[in-house]
Every structure is written in C-alpha cells, then in structure tokens.
C-alpha cells in the first residue's frame, strides 16, 4: 500500500481531485458487506462480492474532478469521495453516490507503514 505520510487530512474531508488516483490505487478496499475492490492505475477496477462473484469495470476522474465508475454494459455513477481517518492514520475511503446518496465505506486491507522515529541518542 502507498504511504500517505505527506497527506494531511481529517476524517470526512473530501479527497482532492489531484489525490483521487493515489487514494483509490493505494490498496485493496474492504467494504462493510464483505465485498472488496481494487483500482488499477490504468483505470480498471475489480469488485468482488462477499460470495466471491467478481465484476470488472472502469474508474476515472471526470472533468469536474469527481471520482466516477463505469460498469458495463450501461451503469455509470459519480461519487463524493472522502477520507476515513482514525487518529492520524488514513484507513479508508467513503464513497457517496451523487444523486442517490447511497454511501459505501471501504477500509484499506493493509495500512500504510509510517517510518519509525528513532529516539535521540542518549549521552551517559
């Protein structure tokens, strides 16, 4: 998973359009219903239902800077994308479908590792 140590956000803050590709491709997301989803940098996405049924689609950032997805043959939707933050750690993304208001919260299945801070050397 990508490291977000340079991203300063709070829980519920919208994901800036410039960060959407990084946010969605950072790692696999696990949703509340047990489904998982991955996003590739080439625009492909794979959604796997809790029962194991996979669906392939496409994702993109539209001209208004919104996250959108397309599921063949005809389903297209755009979402308000927000960070899920616990403490000082980005742990997932919240997708709210525009127009319908349906919300899906996905948590990264692996967390970004922050570098350990070394203690200052102690002089005796």
Can you say where each PLM-predicted feature lies in the sequence?
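Lipid interaction determinants
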Residues: 1-58, 62-124
